[in-house]
Structure formats: C-alpha cells, structure tokens
C-alpha cells in the first residue's frame, strides 16, 4: 500500500510538470514512450501507469513501446537517435543512464547530451 501511495505521489508530481507544456500546441500527434526493457517488469508497469495518465491529461495517445536488449541500450539508443521534438521519450533507469555508461567502453549514446530529463519517477530499493 505504501508503494502505491509513493508511486501515485511521484506520478502526480511528474504530471504537474506538464502544465507549462500545455500552453504550447503540444502534442498534436501520439507520443511514444520507449521502455528499454521487456514487458512485465517494474519499468514496464510504471511506464504503463504513467502513460495512461499522460494520455488523459494531454488529450493525445501515449504509446508504450518495449524495446529490450543490451541492458537497456537498444531502446535508449532508439530514443537518442529520434528527432528531439518531445514526441519520443525513454523511461530510463540507473542501468540505462549510469551503469551502462561506465560498464561499456563505447556506449551507444551519451546520457549528458542525448537526453533531456523530464521527471524523476521512482526509487528502487536495494
């Protein structure tokens, strides 16, 4: 129950950040949320909850796309290569945005230059 409350509070805080964006004519088409892991895991669950509420608030469909592989680098790379117009986002994690950058000699993307943070959604305890 405590986790549900925390997730809801985090989601509400993240969605509150969408207020300034609503002043613009955005979105005019569906938004894609890439989850760089297989369906059914914790990132997928959080992403689907968030995307449903985002769809309601934005008045536009938010499509969840699971692109697993290479410890999350495959899906994250897809977003890094996408047009930076806000219509493609990644639900990153410590693995995709910190560990992979240090574990691999030549990571497929640079988290400091290829992504713009939007919201901090959840904490995964050890």
Predicted regions and their residues:
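N-terminal (or domain-start) structured segment
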Residues: 23-116
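Bacterial N-terminal signal peptides that target proteins for export
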Residues: 1-10
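Short beta-strands and strand-loop turn motifs
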Residues: 34, 125-126
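Bacterial N-terminal signal peptides
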Residues: 9-17
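Short Pro/Gly-enriched coil loops immediately N-terminal to beta-strands
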Residues: 113, 118-125
């Amino acid at each position: 129950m405590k986790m549900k409350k925390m997730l809801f509070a985090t989601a509400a805080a993240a969605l509150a950040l969408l207020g300034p964006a609503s002043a613009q004519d955005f979105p005019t088409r569906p938004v894609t949320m890439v989850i760089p892991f297989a369906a059914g895991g914790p990132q997928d669950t959080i992403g689907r909850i968030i995307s449903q509420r985002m769809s309601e608030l934005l008045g536009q469909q938010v499509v969840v796309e699971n692109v697993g592989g290479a410890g999350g680098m495959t899906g994250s790379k897809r977003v890094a290569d996408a047009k930076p117009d806000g219509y493609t986002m990644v639900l990153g994690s410590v693995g995709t945005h910190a560990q992979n950058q240090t574990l691999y000699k030549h990571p497929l993307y640079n988290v400091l230059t290829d992504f713009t943070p939007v919201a901090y959604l959840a904490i995964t305890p050890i």
